[in-house]
């Protein structure tokens, strides 16, 4: 099953990256936009995308405004927030009734502190697929975990235990503006094996590897809130683990990158 799902994702990636003649590609793009009800008002028109991949990875025409105050945490992506809560004895939920151990997801030996609040952001095929820094960050490590590429939609999350932990993923280990540890996890999915990171082009996902790879940064890579960290090639999931922050009521809310979702407590 693992080999099949990963192979399907590689094949899909090859087909989606193919550039058909312009009149054919425009029809393909139009069909995709219609099926998934994509709003292109913030993006280039569909005839400007030379492949499906180009459409999947579309960039915003204009920067979105967001609160620049350093104590405000913003949504890192366009997504539906499916779960959010404080960790309970190192347990987080991929969906209601389906817990997993947070330290396994991010690659730590010891359980994570209950001071961590986690937020699951589900990016559907219609969403803008880039992900951004939710606050000023210093990136210490990027950890790549080879794994399955199972779908991350709700039916699959209800069916497959430890789906996030078993799927291919990249966990960024960082420090936030207060010096607290923060984890930003990009989870792969069927047809979404490739995840790109702008700060390090050496991070290679869906590359037939079967082992964990760690990319360490000394000095740390500094990024500003709102900076474009990278993108999926289709929809998938971001899981954010953050401390010392008060969040709004987020569960089952659709958010846009740049929206204020929380506020850091004063030290």
Swiss-Prot record:
Topological type in the membrane: Peripheral membrane protein
Cofactor binding notes: Binds 1 pyruvoyl group covalently per subunit.
Assigned GO CC terms: plasma membrane
EC number: 4.1.1.65
Alphabetical UniProt keywords: Cell membrane, Decarboxylase, Lipid biosynthesis, Lipid metabolism, Lyase, Membrane, Phospholipid biosynthesis, Phospholipid metabolism, Pyruvate, Zymogen
InterPro entries: PS_Dcarbxylase, PSD-B, PSD_type1_pro
Cofactor: pyruvate
A biological-process GO annotation: phosphatidylethanolamine biosynthetic process
Pathway: Phospholipid metabolism; phosphatidylethanolamine biosynthesis; phosphatidylethanolamine from CDP-diacylglycerol: step 2/2
Residues with PTM Pyruvic acid (Ser): 236
Site (Cleavage (non-hydrolytic)): 235-236
Principal subcellular localisation of the protein: membrane
Entry's Gene Ontology molecular function annotations: phosphatidylserine decarboxylase activity
Top-level taxon of origin: Bacteria
Subunit and partners: Heterodimer of a large membrane-associated beta subunit and a small pyruvoyl-containing alpha subunit.
PANTHER family: PHOSPHATIDYLSERINE DECARBOXYLASE, PHOSPHATIDYLSERINE DECARBOXYLASE PROENZYME, MITOCHONDRIAL
Designated name of the protein: Phosphatidylserine decarboxylase proenzyme
